[in-house]
Amino acid sequence: YKFSVEETREVVMQRDGTVRAARFCAACHDQVPLFSGQFDDPEYDTEHNPTGQAGITCMTCHAMTRINGVHGNGDFTIADPPRYPFAFSESAWLRSISEQLIKAKPAFHSKTLLKPFHRSAEFCSTCHKASLPAEVNHYHWLRGQNHYDSFLLSGVSGHRVDSFYYPAQAVSRCSECHM
C-alpha cells in the first residue's frame, strides 16, 4: 500500500502539480493525515511523520456519522464524537481517570461510537468497494476491489437467485463472519 500511494502521489504531482488525486486512497487507509490536512502536502513523509504510522484506527470507522451511499471510495461522513472528560488532558493522571470512566460507564462510549449502520453490509461498502475514477488515471473509470457486490451477489447473502451455495440461513451482514 505504501509503495502504491507514494507512487500515485509522485505521478499525480508531476502530472497535475498537486497530490489531491491520491486522496481517494486516504479516505479509508490514511484518515489521520487526510483529515488533518497533512496528506495534501507534497512533502508529506509517511515514514517520519507520526500521522503516517496511524493507519486504520478505531476512529476510522467509529467517527462515521452517515453512510452516503454504496459506491465505495470512502463515501461516508465523519464528525469528532463526544469524549469522556479528560480524554485529551496533558496530565497522564487525568487521562487515566478518563480511561477508568470508560470502564466504569461504558454505555456512553458504546452509544456515541457504535451506530446501527456499523452492523450493516452498506457500512462495509464504504471502503470495501473501490474504483479508480477518471480524474485519477485520466483514462476512464476502472473497478478496483469490490467485496460488497460480491457479497450481495452470493448465495450467502440470500439475494442471489442462481447461486450454487445457500447456507441454512442467509447472512445479512459482513460482520457476521468477518468481525
For the regions a language model picked out, list residue spans one by one:
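Catalytic cores of secreted or luminal carbohydrate-active enzymes
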Residues: 170-179
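Sequence context of c-type cytochrome heme-c attachment sites
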Residues: 1-54, 60, 65-119, 125-168
